[in-house]
UniProtKB/Swiss-Prot annotation:
Keywords: Glycoprotein, Host cytoplasm, Host nucleus, Secreted, Signal, Virulence. The RxLR-dEER motif acts to carry the protein into the host cell cytoplasm through binding to cell surface phosphatidylinositol-3-phosphate. The gene is RXLR-C17. It is found in: Secreted; Host cytoplasm; Host nucleus. Residues 1-25 form the signal peptide. Belongs to the RxLR effector family. A motif (RxLR-dEER) lies at residues 43-62. Glycans are attached at residue 73. Induction: Expression is up-regulated during plant colonization, 3 days after infection. This is Secreted RxLR effector protein RXLR-C17. The keyword Secreted applies. The keyword Glycoprotein applies. It comes from Plasmopara halstedii (Downy mildew of sunflower). Secreted effector that suppresses pattern-triggered immunity (PTI) in plant host.
């Protein structure tokens, strides 16, 4: 009787050892599987982080460039208005002060204006002057009736090649809302005013001007002052021939900010996000104090001018600490 008992205990002990080995193996296998999963996940995260860092390093803390179609020779389907806000939300928050596609857009338009043949240039210039006179008579707007292209403001000069493109599309019967919305994606953040957008449409020969102006108003209402200011060309590396345009754009930006922050007191105006942003850019660009003061005086009350200039002269906000 003792021998079976001893044998039974021996077999039981062996079975227990076997079970321990099995559970140990299962535990090791499970841990290995988890480690593999964790390693795979970490590797993916590192890859994404590496990509993000690359974008930060190469693109100055902005997302990869998303170019919208501007080629007016393309046939585009008209996008639903419901997608407008989505398109704006995707595009504008990802853009930084050094976003270059608007710079490229202006460069392209200025280049096309310089090489434009004399006959179409004269034709579109006459259309522009005619549209100016029509708007002045019908809308009581003050326009300088220039006799030469060089006398036009930088923004008005850009209207000529753009209007010529749109006019060609109209003559082909191919112009549609998609062309216009795509173009507005560039005109609005670059600071084109409502009257200039209307002038562009009239110069191009559009009949239903108000319908297209309505799209401009709708898009503009969805763009905040901060988003618009992100497209400034306030950069120390700006090309010298863009200085005049840059100054004009700054004037428009300050006017926009003044209207957006009309209810903010003079004591706290420089602490707002949008004013803080523009002062950072101005400080980086070492913008002349006297020129900034003139622009401010045309856009806001005296007490706010004093507050902004005081902060700017003191070097606030200092870009080195941002």
């Amino acid at each position: 009787m003792r021998e079976p008992a001893f044998s039974f205990r021996l077999h039981l002990f062996a079975a227990m050892i076997l079970l321990v080995d099995v559970f140990s193996a299962l535990s090791i296998t499970t841990q290995t599987f988890r480690n593999v999963q964790r390693h795979s996940t970490d590797r993916q995260l590192r890859a994404r982080d590496s990509q993000a860092k690359n974008y930060v390093i190469r693109d100055e803390e902005r997302m990869p460039l998303r170019k919208l179609p501007y080629d007016l020779n393309l046939s585009l389907s008209s996008p639903p208005v419901a997608t407008l806000r989505t398109a704006l939300e995707l595009l504008y928050p990802q853009a930084g002060p050094s976003q270059l596609w608007h710079f490229e857009f202006v460069t392209q338009m200025k280049r096309e204006l310089s090489v434009m043949q004399s006959h179409p240039k004269k034709l579109i210039f006459d259309q522009l002057i005619g549209a100016m006179r029509s708007m002045n008579r019908n809308m009581h707007m003050k326009w300088n009736h220039a006799s030469d292209i060089s006398e036009l403001s930088p923004y008005t000069q850009l209207i000529l090649p753009i209007a010529l493109k749109l006019r060609q599309r109209l003559s082909e019967g191919a112009s549609n809302d998609a062309d216009w919305m795509s173009l507005l994606m560039r005109l609005i953040p670059y600071g084109f005013l409502r009257k200039e957008v209307e002038l562009l449409l009239r110069t191009a020969g559009y009949d239903n001007v108000q319908n297209y102006i309505a799209l401009y108003d709708q898009m503009l209402s969805k763009v905040s002052a901060e988003d618009t200011l992100k497209f400034q060309l306030l950069d120390s590396n700006i090309a010298p021939n863009f200085q005049e345009l840059n100054k004009e754009f700054l004037y428009r930006s300050v006017s926009l900010l003044a209207s957006k922050t009309d209810g903010v007191t003079a004591d706290s105006i420089v602490q707002t996000t949008c004013w803080s942003f523009i002062l950072i850019q101005l400080t980086k660009a070492k913008y002349p104090q006297d020129e900034l003061q003139k622009i401010l005086e045309d856009s806001m009350p005296a007490e706010k001018v004093v507050a902004v200039m005081k902060s700017y002269k003191e070097g606030f906000p200092n870009p080195a600490h941002r």
